[in-house]
Structures are given as structure tokens and as C-alpha cells.
Amino acid sequence: MKIYTRTGDKGETGLFDGTRVSKADPRVEAYGTVDETNALLGVAATSTTDAELRGILHDLQRDLFAVGAQLADPKWGVKPRKEKTRLTEGRVAELEALIDRAEAELPALKRFILPGGSQVGAVLHLARTVCRRAERRMVSLTATAAVAPLLITYINRLSDLLFVLARLASRRDGCEEIPW
């Protein structure tokens, strides 16, 4: 399979079902922003020496491929075509368990903190903000297209997890949080 097709040279792209749309289409904006989040998780995963964190990030990247695939398929916006692209309520619960586990290792927040910390922590903070943008793009898409509510729930919970993982990575790397 070639990486270039020349079919997008005039500002259009193909969706999963073959439909051609503008690269500025809200659906493309939504799954494109999910892809940006995924790329940032890749940067964090390759930057950390923490094997547990790297494994978590790789699992999240796989999830984001499923989210992107479902968003790129207008005929299956609510029900995914393939099992591989299906997220479940159980997966959201797993993210919540990861949040709880990470928070148990962290001091309670009493005020806002500045994004930053260690290099990995800073990348995870950036991933969190891009994830929030993905969520906003997905919510915007719901004005014109069907989007599975679970996808929005998943992305919302993911951004919470990324915040906690950013704090955890920075703490494990010996960096102090800077209060606002």
C-alpha cells in the first residue's frame, strides 16, 4: 500500500465508507484531533523509562485508533462495524480504575498547578489539552452527525487520566508541582 494516493491534493479526503469530504469537515476535525492526541501519547511513551506507564500509553493509543476508526465511519457512527473498533463501558471503568490507582500515589490537589513537571509530564499535559480539543470537536460533530455517546465519555475520561498520569510521571521523575 502506498502512503500517497494523490486523491487528497485538492483538499478532500475519503471516509471509511468511501465518501469524499472536505479536510475541513467536522468529522475529519474530530478524528484528526484524536490522531494528534495519539501521536502525543507516542512521544510520551518513547520518552519515558517507566515500563508500566509506557504499557498504559500503548493501550491508550490502541483505544484511540478505535475511536478514530469509528469517527471516520459515518454509516457506523453509533455502532462500530468491527469488534476491534468497539469501546465498552468496561473500558471507561478501566480508565477510572487507572485514575484511582494513580491518584493514590499522589498528594491531594489543593490548588491548580502549572502544566509542566518532567519532560514526560509536560508531554502528557499537552496530550491532555489536545484530548480536550478532540472532545470539543466530537461534541461539535454531534450537531450534524451521529456520534456514539460512549466515545465522548471515553475521551472525557481519557483527558482526566492524562492529567493524573502527567502528575504521576513528573512525581516519579522527581519533579515538584508548581502551584498557580
Where are each of the predicted segments found?
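Phosphate/pyrophosphate-binding loop motifs in nucleotide- or prenyl diphosphate-using proteins
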Residues: 1-180
